Amino acid sequence: MLDALGVIRIEPKAGLDSHAIAGDKIPWSYTWPHVPFGELEVRLKHYLQSEAQEPRYAEMWLRVWQELVPQDVTAYLRHQLRIHQFPDFFLVELARLLMPYDSRYSLGHWRYACWAAVRSMASISLQYPGNVEMLRSTLGSELPRRLRLTQGSLEGKLCFSPSHSLPDCALTSVFCGIATSLGDRYWMSPPSLELF
């Protein structure tokens, strides 16, 4: 998002003026030298609440939304797996499902489906302790089934909003509360250009 707004530039390789955030290892450089780095938060918030909300940025915000949803879904599934003490290797099942479904379902529907699928896994685990293949199969079948159920639900049903679920993401909070006026629509609606 900062790259799209021109605040930073992603560099092809690390250089003297580039930075890398631990964990990401992606080199970047700061491109707003007229704004001291310490004042960036206030200036960026003002920029996001004014110029960045112009219609010309709508497609960029849609791309950001489309990038945030899979990350939020993955973080939420990981969170649910850890609550039930399942290993992260079950996240592989999610990767094959995210692409075909990502434009039809809201993040709240994904969160509901992840929660329900992991609860089903927990039930199967009690009946068949240690049967990893059965758990994998349960997750692989329950996630799409639960997602399909959300399509026929009434507004707000089978949909988890951020106020009732963890983990929380600072970028998501900025995106739906400051940079755009999406608010709860971020959780309740699939990514759509018409919402900007």
Language-model features: where?
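Basic, alpha-helical nucleic-acid-binding regions used in initiation and control of genome expression
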Residues: 1-196
